[in-house]
From Swiss-Prot:
Belongs to the GARNL3 family. The keyword Lipid biosynthesis does not apply. PANTHER family: GTPASE-ACTIVATING RAP_RAN-GAP DOMAIN-LIKE PROTEIN 3, RAP GTPASE-ACTIVATING PROTEIN. InterPro entries: CNH_dom, Rap/Ran-GAP_sf, Rap/Ran_GAP_dom, Rap1_Ran_GAP. GO terms for biological process: regulation of small GTPase mediated signal transduction. Keywords: GTPase activation. This is GTPase-activating Rap/Ran-GAP domain-like protein 3. It comes from Gallus gallus.
Length: 917
């Protein structure tokens, strides 16, 4: 590989001498606060005489500055608008199973509760990434996991259930052959919640403080009418064929008109108080309350100045409405102000309100409100009131289905069997019968899928969203056609220091690669500490492994002067001698007062710190000028464990004095070890036969330590309290929570507000505060390279001109028409099989994930409400406004053309529709 010239190297290191934004953010990436999502308050409403009428506890989100007290501006002010747990990613049975050959199994667990298992071998988003998608249906809900496909390794039903922590059975799983089972399983999936929504809209005049007064408003103001027009379109109810949200579309008994819109594939009907029937004789307006009072989410549009008495949820007599969105319009600056009230039991949901929660761009306000309300209704369905009802319904449906299938258990089912492909091999004598059964199975599934789409009940697709929207996790091409195997890496300024099979390389976007060490030095772990001028690395393996410490400035000088490339034998002076035989090390990653290093040598932990040096570099002390910084470190103590740790993380105590901790993972447990005393305490025990430890990530909520414990498919948050009498207070907390990944990750990265899981072929992105899924990117042959500051990963892509563009060029020319790196990956992988595949390096800037502050305009998850469409002449453009979903119209057109074919052979375009969805 050609080395750069001295001039190029000098130019490169101008960037190395400047600390990157990501380096500054990296030390506080684990800081977060739930206060950004509001605080719980006791809200009381009283009558005109001051007597208390109703009271309730609600979480109040107002985006006020007091929610951010004590936080450095820019530390966390995210306002990216994401639908949480989007149906496109969560409704697996509709997306991956219907219309395709798959297996369904029935069984009972050790407690005699029936369960169903569905398995399909599918191509992940048509990216030539075969995976087993598995769904376990139980009364407590569905569990979904992806398992890798191997053409040489068979996968049994038992092993799939074992991966789902279901290992003991009263009756082993047997396969269901009847195609009608697809209808029943689709009904089970629909219990997760409707894909369409109905929201109440209540108009309140200035000074109105009771629900009777608000519901009695016959008409709204001009500003209220403009707000309704912003929300959606006015539609005539009589004869309406779309989603009706419980309104009468035949006899006008619920009004003549309503407001309707489609947002990212979701149909939304608004129950507007002034459009519902009004009765002069009935002061309570029962008909209006019947609809709006039974909506989970209600928007309250309140007239008047901000100093006037404000709306409180306790003013509304409803036991069903859990979320209120208070909207005020300011005529002076043509802006909207938003405030959210959520019943205390509703889990946290985003997006958090900006500070201040004032929107001058009306389209962005519409996007924010709709996403907030959709996420809020989904979160409400997880409250005990709704989840217990859903569990009873699921239990009833599953038991009823089990009883219906019992007579056929021995006649039409097989015992448990192993399979390694979607289509199991059949004996020649029964192959024709099996093929006929599969054809009928697929035909029924495709017909069911189309029917669901025509009704408007299909999970949303990405067809109505903007593919060109810039997301915080959007990657940039960093290095094209990288031929080496990567062992580990870390950021150094704007460059990347990489340990490869060819040695240690310094890679910079748009620059020629520089070799720093030759291939005799094999580094397995590394940390580049720019602020301390250190490079820490673990080399080799087994008995010869050591911890090395280099001075960054010395390494930089060697490269600039083009001296001889260092080898393993030039690093003798950089060894920390007592670290021989180490297999793992960890450093404190956050802003504590001193650098701490813990080295694991089998089951022994060695604690190392940096010596306190009162002399600075300007004094000319021999210690500061020494080329090797080994003498600047001191050994504090040794701690013995019962087993060698697999995962190790340092946790900063609240005072930093005798209360720092080490989290270690081994066997089936995570333990906390006191750095000062060496005592260990059980933090979490894992009830599973096989444990795959992934990570233990230290995070700090409002300055208090917590840990994200990642193993198997699980990520669990545990809060760690200050030490009391020498031991940490480890106890269940209301803030502890856990969630499951869809695929077992090999690495997890926290960049608040996001947590990213890296698997062999995908990046799964969730929110830290609630574990909700926001995006899944399919990235074949994915390898995480570095993540301490900016995130770098290696992935397969076909050789093309677009893959050679630099991240700097991409950043400068990025526009709504510019495809993201993910788009380039997906496009290239869908090209012909004959193209030569290569590995490229991609970069996700940490500043995009955690570093943006609240500024106008807010990010919008959709294309603008009005877009321009070029005509054939290329000159004139037409405005296109939001309207009833085109996808529904297209589905109806397909249905009309294929109604006859549904009774016979499958048409070609039928399969096109199925694959599109």
């Amino acid at each position: 590989m050609e080395l750069s010239s001295a001039e190029a190297v000098s130019t490169r290191f101008l960037g190395l001498t400047q600390r990157s934004v990501s380096e500054d953010l990296g030390c506080r990436r684990g800081e977060f606060s739930r206060k950004h999502y509001g605080s719980v308050e006791l809200l009381i409403s009283s009558d005109a005489d001051g007597a208390i009428q109703r009271a309730g506890r609600f979480r109040v989100e107002n985006g006020s500055s007091d929610e951010n007290t004590g936080y450095t501006p820019g530390t966390w002010h995210r306002t990216d608008v994401h639908l949480e747990n989007p149906e496109y990613y969560t409704r697996w049975y509709f997306k991956y199973f219907l219309g395709k050959v798959h297996q369904n199994y029935i069984g009972t667990d050790s407690e005699k509760n029936p369960f169903f298992l569905s398995v399909v071998l599918s191509d992940q988003n048509n990216q030539r990434v075969p995976q087993y998608h598995s769904i376990l249906w139980r009364k407590t809900g569905t569990q979904k996991i992806c398992l890798p496909y191997s053409p040489t390794k068979t996968l049994s039903v038992k092993s799939i259930l074992s991966a789902m922590s279901l290992e003991k059975f009263e009756k082993g799983p047997r396969e269901i052959f009847h195609p009608d089972i697809q209808k029943d399983l689709l009904v089970l999936e629909e219990q997760e919640g409707s894909v369409n929504f109905k929201f109440g809209v209540l108009y309140a005049k200035d000074g109105q403080l009771t629900d009777d007064e608000m519901f009695s408003n016959e008409t709204g103001s001009e500003s209220f009418q403009r707000f309704l027009h912003l929300l959606g379109d006015t539609i005539t109810l009589k004869g309406w064929t779309g989603y009706r949200g419980g309104l009468d579309t035949k006899n006008d008994t619920t009004g003549t008109f309503s407001i309707y819109t489609v947002y990212q594939g979701h149909e939304i009907m608004f129950h507007v108080s002034t459009m519902l029937p009004y009765s002069r004789e009935n002061k309570q307006q029962v008909e209006r309350k019947r609809h709006i009072g039974n909506d989970i989410v209600t928007i309250v549009f309140q007239e008047g100045e901000e100093t006037a008495p404000a709306f409180k949820p306790s003013m509304i007599r409803s036991h069903f409405t859990h979320i209120f969105a208070l909207v005020r319009y300011n005529k002076q600056n043509d802006s909207y102000r938003l405030k959210i009230f959520s019943e205390e039991s509703v889990p946290l949901f985003g997006p958090p309100l900006p500070s201040p929660p004032v929107f001058t761009n009306h389209q962005e306000f519409r996007d924010f409100v709709l996403v907030k309300l959709i996420n809020g209704e989904k979160a409400t369905l997880e409250t005990p009131t709704f989840s217990q009802k859903r569990q009873r319904t699921l239990d009833m449906l599953i038991r009823s289905l089990y009883q219906d299938l019992m007579p056929d258990l021995h006649k039409n089912m097989l015992n448990r069997r192993s399979f390694s492909d979607v289509l199991p091999d059949s004996p020649k004598s029964t192959r024709k019968k099996e093929e006929a059964r599969q054809a009928e199975f697929v035909r029924l599934g495709q017909a069911l899928k189309l029917k669901t789409g025509v009704k408007g009940d299909a999970p949303t697709t990405l067809a109505t969203t903007s593919f060109c929207k810039k997301e915080p996790w959007e990657s940039q091409s960093f290095c094209s056609n990288f031929p080496h195997e990567v062992v580990c890496a870390d950021s150094w300024g704007q460059s990347l220091l990489v340990s490869t099979d060819a040695g240690i390389l310094l890679i910079d976007d748009g620059q020629t690669t520089v070799q720093v060490f030759d291939k005799t030095l094999q580094i397995k772990q590394m940390h580049v500490l720019e602020a301390l001028d250190y490079l820490i690395a673990r080399t080799d393996k087994g008995k010869d492994s050591r911890l090395l410490v280099f001075r960054l400035s010395s390494v930089q000088k060697d490269i600039e002067t083009k001296q001889v490339i260092r080898s393993k034998y030039d690093c003798r002076e950089n060894k920390l001698e007592r670290t021989k035989g180490c297999h793992l090390y960890a450093i404190n990653t956050h802003h504590s007062s001193e650098l701490r290093i813990v080295v694991a040598i089998r089951n022994k932990l060695l604690l190392i710190t940096k010596k306190y040096n009162p002399c600075n570099s300007l004094t000319g002390s021999s210690l500061s000028l020494s080329e090797s910084p080994v003498e600047e470190f001191q050994y504090i103590r040794e701690i013995c464990l019962s087993d060698p740790p697999v995962v190790m993380t340092l946790v900063d105590g609240p005072t930093g004095d005798s209360d720092n901790m080490i989290c270690v993972a081994y066997r089936h447990q995570f333990d906390l070890v006191n750095e000062s005393t060496g005592e260990s305490y059980r933090l979490h025990h894992i009830e599973a036969n096989k444990v795959n430890f992934v990570a233990a990530i230290d995070v700090y909520e409002d300055g208090e330590a917590g840990l994200l414990l990642c193993y198997n498919y699980v990520c669990q948050y545990r809060k760690v309290y200050p030490f009391n009498g020498g031991s940490p207070l480890i106890q269940p907390s209301a803030y502890d929570f856990h969630f499951s990944w869809n695929q077992v990750p090999y690495a997890v990265v926290c960049a608040f507000p996001y947590i990213l899981a890296f698997t062999t072929d995908s990046i799964e992105i969730r929110l830290v505060v609630n574990g909700n899924l926001v995006h899944t990117a399919v990235v074949p042959e994915l390898q995480l390279v570095a993540s301490r500051s900016d995130i770098y990963f290696k992935a397969t892509a076909a050789v093309s001109g677009s893959s050679h563009s630099s991240s700097k060029e991409m950043s400068s020319r990025s526009s709504p028409q510019t495809p993201t790196a993910y788009d380039m990956l997906e496009c290239s992988l869908s090209s012909s099989e004959g193209e030569v595949a290569c590995k490229n390096l991609y970069k996700i800037p940490l500043s995009n994930l955690v570093g943006r502050s609240i500024e106008r305009p807010l990010k919008s998850p959709l294309t603008p409400k009005v877009v321009t469409t070029p005509t054939s002449s290329g000159i004139t453009s037409l405005p296109v406004t939001h309207s009833p979903s085109l996808s529904r119209m297209e589905i109806k057109e397909i249905a009309n053309r294929t109604r006859k074919e549904l009774l016979g052979k499958l048409p070609l375009f039928f399969s096109v529709y199925i694959s599109y969805h």
